[in-house]
Amino acid sequence: MRLHYLLRLLSFAFLWFILRSFLVKYLNFFTLGFFFCFSSTPRNFAYLVALFMLCLSTFSAFSNLTLFSWAKYSKLSLGSNVSNSTVVESSYISVIAPFFKIGFTLLSLLSLSPSSLSESNPCQDSSDSTCKSSVLSFFASSISASKFKLSLNVFNCSSITSLRSCRIFCLSSIFLSLSCSLINSCAFFCL
């Protein structure tokens, strides 16, 4: 009965991480790429979208902390062969990583001039280099964040091998991270 409950919880965590990966990574690419540089959307709307992404990244950091705290407790209860230091170390890394993305998003927000938020998108003008540089810096931060997440997933897959569901989840996360990293890399070099 307890194993059945644990498997259901792992399945819910698997679906949640897929949804979160789509929201945090793909939404970052499409919103800042389309609304911020490739359309005539006013900058105040792009500013609100960036703030929404900032909230998602913050929620992602605290959800990682909650999930890995639960994982630490469950592994201690089940008597897994994964050491406590491994679980604690991976939890701290998973919480620190989204905060780097939060910092890069804040830098992108600060690069927007508050006096021109109500104007049309200045990226339509090819002579404006401020918006272009901020978008390029955001794509560069997305590339580094994806690679950091990829290395973290490889670390988790090599350490958590007791449950089949954990391995399936880790491999799926690696595939998503590779896909996001390739998309961000292509967007960075095409701009």
From Swiss-Prot:
UniProt keyword Transport, yes or no: no
Keywords annotated in UniProt: Membrane, Transmembrane, Transmembrane helix
Superkingdom, natural source: Eukaryota
A cellular component term, taken from the record's GO annotations: membrane
Transmembrane segments: 12-32, 48-68, 92-112, 168-188
Main location per the UniProt record: membrane
Membrane topology of this protein: Multi-pass membrane protein
Coiled-coil regions, chain positions: none
Cystine pairings recorded for this chain: none
Compartments, record wording: Membrane
Note: Partially overlaps YDR412W.
Name of protein: Putative uncharacterized protein YDR413C
Organism: Saccharomyces cerevisiae (strain ATCC 204508 / S288c) (Baker's yeast)
